[in-house]
Amino acid sequence: MSVKKQPIVTWLVLGAMMILASLFLTVLPKFGITLGPDPVEKLALAQVPAWVDAQIIEVDGISRRGERLEDIRSIVIHYVANPGSSAQANHDWYVNPESEVSSHFLIGLEGEVIQCIPLDEYSSASNHRNKDTISIEVCHPDETGKFNDESYHSLVQLTAWLLEVSGLQPEDVIRHYDITGKDCPRYFVQHEDSWLDFLEDVAAAVEATQ
């Protein structure tokens, strides 16, 4: 019994389709083009962990603009630049009409985590990158800007969770400094080795959950 051979053109078409599929999967994401579920919609549906205290501020057009993120490309780490202040005090400042600033999350001196802005909305923390980033502000005990152990642990935990729900990678975690050159978060800007250690701790935390 003879087997009918497929025309060579069929194999050429299949080969071309495989090449195109590979391009879609590997090249387009580098230009911010993704296939499948909307990453911002995934953030909107994410279940915030029980250890996060959700105190969402009201839409005021400034601190909370109420605008949807255009994309999610980075997680930005900040420090509050107000030594000794609590997460709650900084949250309450965001609510003040004169503040004009906010972040998605605040981490306090005892490791408490407060959510201020919904994950799928702009915060007012990272300048021109507000449109495609999630921001975390961390409290610190003194002018050096170094985070204490409780705050640091929560920062690693929160950042790892955000990477999980956003689909980002540890290399997508950046400092405010990396956007504007601002001395923020101060200790991680002035101590590059500590920043790299933090990224390693985040990567280890992500791996531990997989």
Model-based region annotation:
Residues 2-17, 26-53, 142-210:
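Basic/polar, cationic surfaces and motifs that engage anionic cell-wall
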Residues 2-126:
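N-terminal catalytic cores of peptidoglycan-degrading enzymes
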Residues 70, 98, 129, 144-152:
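Solvent-exposed, acidic/flexible segments
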Residues 77, 136, 155:
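Conserved, mostly hydrophobic/aromatic
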Residues 79, 138, 177:
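Residues immediately flanking
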Residues 127-135:
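Short coil-to-beta-strand
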Residues 134-143:
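Cell-envelope and extracellular/periplasmic
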